[in-house]
């Protein structure tokens, strides 16, 4: 049995898994996948003479009658898929991450499974100049952020068809199980999209690709084909907008939220009638950092602009024990489930990131955990000293390198 299997079965801690990954580099390609060259440089593909899934795994003697066959349909799919796939807890730059031919989508792409997530995933799609991806529909929630390029997406068919035009920085929802097709409007350059989806969760529940990809059902409460579906927007709460399309979240409105740290501002979106995926954006000032916290749900975070680092650890945040990840515009990180993490801005501009979480979905599943935040008086004082050192280093580097190319560390000890 492999360590990745142990991680999913609970007999191998996420902490140990992350430490092994960080020792090898940024990302480990999944077994059975065609790993991009960049992933190979950061973690070699593990050679096996026998697939560990060939061994039947049973529950312990005191659970499930001592003979329940342990099932993990999503993990089984990961092992068997031939699509280009990487696994880890971050990628350096989603705009330049290597992609490979992907027949099912009619273009190029790479599948991202972060930190052993089993509810959410990420996918990078690349559309060649003046080309389109294959028309598709899926029985799962999906949000799209435009990493680069410009193009259009057509949703639905017949009288219920809608079309949007998007560009770099656009955010939109793909309504559940609605036929859609992405096209590149640029005749010279490829377009690149980042999708965050709930495919893993749906695979865990139903275990059927046929159902997920070929369900003949219209969720009219989520998509009714109205002409203003992608243009309407409503402010429902102080920091909440109900909308299905945002032209450019890199410059869109954020509302002050001092409870998350001095100078912090955020915005949340309710999109597509989704009940799991909860997107939000947050930015914070130069020379500041967010309060450390942890949450009982998975999260995938894309840096939109700025430069800094994140500290993370399982049970606490101590400067001497925490792991450190540097980030820049285009970096994507997914903190391990219920680990403490804290974001620091060492750049010369406000840092802004886009995050997708599960919101209160785990609570609705009965998971008895709460969001926990480390308030300033309880913070390890050495963390502030570490931050000050990093700011001085960043300032010195900026003065000696007028056009800096930030170095990216991958899970190093702080």
Which role does the model predict for each range below?
Residues 143-145, 173, 188-205, 301-302, ...:
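A short hydrophobic beta-strand segment most commonly corresponding to one strand
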Residues 1-16, 38-40:
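N-terminal secretory signal peptides
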Residues 139-152, 156-157, 296-315:
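Glycine- and acidic-residue-biased ligand/ion/polar-headgroup-sensing regions
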Residues 43-118, 209-276, 280, 381-414:
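A short, N-terminal "cap"/entry segment at the start of jelly-roll beta-barrel domains
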Residues 158-173, 316-334:
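Short acidic-glycine-tyrosine-enriched beta hairpin
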Residues 14-29:
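N-terminal export leaders
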Residues 108, 123-137, 280-294:
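Conserved short histidine dyad/triad with adjacent acidic residue
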Residues 132-134, 152, 171-172, 176-182, ...:
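Histidine-centered metal-chelating micro-motifs
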């Amino acid at each position: 049995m492999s360590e990745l299997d142990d991680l999913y079965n609970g007999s191998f801690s996420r902490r140990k898994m992350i430490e092994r990954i960080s020792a090898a580099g940024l990302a480990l390609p999944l077994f059975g996948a065609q790993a991009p060259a960049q992933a190979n440089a950061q973690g070699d593909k593990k050679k096996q003479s026998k697939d560990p899934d060939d061994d039947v795994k049973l529950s312990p003697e005191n659970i499930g009658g001592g003979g329940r066959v342990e099932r993990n349909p999503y993990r089984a799919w990961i092992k068997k898929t031939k699509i280009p796939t990487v696994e880890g807890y971050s990628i350096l730059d989603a705009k330049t991450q290597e992609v490979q031919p992907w027949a099912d989508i009619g273009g190029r792409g790479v599948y991202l499974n972060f930190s052993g997530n089993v509810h959410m995933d990420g996918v990078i799609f690349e559309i060649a100049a003046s080309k389109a991806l294959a028309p598709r529909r899926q029985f799962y929630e999906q949000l799209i952020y435009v990493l680069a390029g410009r193009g259009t997406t057509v949703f639905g068919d017949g009288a219920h068809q809608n079309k949007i035009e998007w560009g770099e920085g656009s955010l939109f929802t793909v309504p559940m199980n609605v036929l859609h097709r992405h096209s590149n409007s640029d005749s010279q350059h490829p377009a690149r999209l980042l999708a965050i989806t709930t495919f893993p969760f749906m695979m865990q529940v139903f275990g059927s690709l046929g159902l997920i990809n070929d369900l003949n059902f219209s969720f009219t409460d989520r998509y009714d084909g109205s002409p203003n579906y992608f243009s309407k927007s409503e402010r429902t709460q102080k920091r909440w907008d109900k909308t299905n399309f945002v032209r450019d979240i890199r410059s869109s409105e954020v509302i002050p939220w001092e409870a998350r740290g001095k100078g912090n501002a955020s915005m949340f979106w309710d999109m597509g009638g989704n009940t799991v995926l909860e997107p939000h954006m947050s930015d914070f000032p130069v020379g500041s950092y967010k309060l450390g916290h942890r949450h009982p749900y998975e999260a995938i975070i894309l840096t939109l602009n700025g430069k800094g680092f994140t500290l993370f650890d399982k049970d606490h945040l101590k400067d001497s024990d925490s792991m450190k990840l540097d980030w820049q515009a285009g970096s994507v990180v997914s903190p391990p489930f219920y680990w403490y993490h804290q974001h620091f801005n060492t750049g010369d501009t406000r840092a802004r990131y886009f995050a997708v979480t599960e919101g209160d979905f785990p609570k609705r599943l009965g998971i008895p955990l709460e969001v926990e935040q480390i308030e300033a008086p309880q913070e390890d004082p050495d963390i502030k000293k570490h931050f000050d050192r990093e700011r001085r280093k960043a300032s010195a580097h900026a003065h000696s390198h007028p056009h800096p190319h930030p170095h990216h560390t991958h899970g190093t000890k702080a």
